[in-house]
Amino acid sequence: MKQKLTLRRVLVSTVAALAAAAAVWLLCRWVGYDLQLRIGNEPVYEIANDDYTRIIDVPEDGLWQTVPLEAGQTLYGCRLRFSTHGELYRAGMVMVDLCDADGTILREAAGNYANIFDDNFTGFAFGTAYTAAQAETLCLHIYNVVEWEGPLGLWASTGTVGAMSLTADGVDADATLALQYMTDDSGSWPSDLANGLAPLLAFAAFAAVLLFGLRAPLPLTVAVVGLACGLLFVRVTPALVAPDEYTHLAAAYELASRLGGETPADENGCLLVRESDAPHFGTRSGEIGILAYKAEALARQKEAGGPDALTAVSEAKAGQGSGNYLPQAVGIRLARNAGANFYTMLRQARTFNLIFYLLLAVLAVALAPAALRGLLACIALLPMPLQLAGSLSPDASVLGMVFCYTALCLRLRTKKAVWWEKILLIALGGAVGPAKAIYLPVVLLCFIIPVDNLVGPTEFVRGSFGVRVRSGQLIREAVLVLAGGLWLSANLGELAYAARDMNQMLLAVGAVGIVLLLALVRWLYGKVQNDAKKLRLLKGALACAVALAVVGGVLALSRMGGGLAPDQLLMTNPNGDSIWTFSLGYICRNLPATAKLLLRTIPAQGALWLQGILGTTLGEPIVYRIDVSWLLGVGLVLALLAAALPVQDEQSKPLLGRRTGFGVLGIILCVAASSLVVALNWTPINYETLFGMQGRYWLPVLPLVLLLVKGSRSVCARRDLSRGAALAVTACTLLTLLQGYSLYASWQPVS
């Protein structure tokens, strides 16, 4: 029952929203403060001279150490190795000035004797960094400015190292100080970046609580809250750190070049890029850490863009693009037309991808039956979909399309389709087919729609071979044919590669035979469906045929290919991985070994798969393991289960019947099996667990899993909890963003 909007509800909701925004703002400030204490003002040093064998005391006039700098080289300070001759001094001050060739002081740094220890390096940070405009030689002037208790020495080499001469009292000391350049410094960036996230985080919390309190339409909630959280992921995820983002960048960039009528690759298949973009194209994930955040922020502000002229050859290969990259490519195209620099272009491409995902997600929530809108809203606002949407990943658009198709099929299960819904069903089914190979089984959801709901003004039409069929059945067949045809055109090469060690002609004949048998079974079912005795005979015969086909198929496939000689089994790459992977032939010929690998994988990677579905593991988990608190994962699981609970007094019959539920379960299992087979194709045969399998691959069928939970009615809620669950999911997503930023910023490479 729709509740009336009262002034009291508006005031209470506004106050609660302001309180939530204030709490999130304070929490964000705390994260910045904590990070500043832990990783703020942390320098990075580069060795300039590590050869030191003697001690030179600092004379009254000080020491003058020449420092050659290259054009563009930045110096934040330096670090020197002191000697106190075994003493512990309590008084004295050492100055380190950076001077030009004329002795003009460019930068200054000071150090207290109390912080200088015998035979230890001591850092001196300048007030501001110095960047050489051109190649030049500067000097470090090291001297005392107040009385000190005793002699203070500096370790130096015997003999001058390179062009780094040392002068003491105007005389060449024939030495070079033990010296390290301070090449970078985290400064106040940890707190500054956190403070920059605070307004958007506070707005997301404010909007979520306000819309919940006002009981706003769920599509509006997904649009507003999803946009705020997605833009936060755009900012929090470091450049090229999202899953496979460097590959997606190359594909989207290539498509953007084609949209502009440009030649995207050279004769060797390497991607052509703008001169200003070339340094950022590679074949590995980007860097993380506070210094990576800092470098990205400074580059976005200061780095020059350039004209849209593809004059540089990158390391990335062309030929990875598809229609799934269209939103990202449009963002890149517009940024290049405007002459934007690389990081501005990257952020714009991410934003376009986010907007396209949100359009599809909002459409899915709007299309879904009223009882399922809250459930779909919860899934759409999970951290993982928003993280993918806030990157260059084409999986975001695939997610949106599958969500829309699922919602439309469930919608048409309970109502008669109008003309635009029929067109949308065919279009979405055709789009889901080639979107990603493993999601083809989802197209079968069109069979949960009763034929009567798809029948048009003319109930019967002429089909293939002049057969008289119902128009609704023709629509379902059109969806299957379109999706299957586009799937084959998009994935035939990958399918041939997976079956590379099998007789592909026999496989093709077998596939055609299976299709013809299915068509025969469908025709026979139409003939006997109204005769109970004949229908039982058909089902019995079909069960026997399936059992014989499975046994015979396994025996046939296990002898068709996949055999490797002993010397072939020993062939490995330099890193120790076998050069052979689990092809279809190898899988069929080695079913016990495949089963053992899968059984070992489940306990080893099961928790990571769940994290991948929810989004509590960030970035590319194969490269960086950025895992937020398991408490957030528990909160997200509980929120999803709450959204899936049926309402106790709900009088309407379940959305899925028993037989339909088994069919949906079969679709889920087919998608899971397909993803495992694909991951096996990436896995070397000497691995003990799967390689490359990630939980996010199962995210498109998560609505179906929760739909089965909702239909069980084993546990019921007194009232609909989906709106509160969506608010809880939003809260967990915001906390994931905050902790994710903290983990990204504080990450340190393993030494």
Stretch-by-stretch model annotation:
Residues 1-29, 189-231, 524, 528-548, ...:
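Start-transfer (signal-anchor) and selected internal transmembrane alpha helices
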Residues 9-12, 21-100, 116-137, 143-201:
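Beta-sheet-rich sandwich/jelly-roll-like modules and their strand-loop junctions
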Residues 187-191, 460-543, 552-647:
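Membrane-lumen/periplasm interface segments of multi-pass, membrane-embedded glycan/lipid transferases
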Residues 216-220, 340-343, 364-383:
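Transmembrane-helix signature of polytopic, membrane-embedded enzymes
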Residues 347-370:
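Transmembrane-helix motifs of polytopic, lipid-linked glycan transferases
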Residues 387, 421-437, 442-448, 482:
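Membrane-interface alpha helices of multi-pass inner-membrane proteins
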Residues 391-398:
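Short acidic/glycine- and proline-prone juxtamembrane loop motifs at membrane-interface regions
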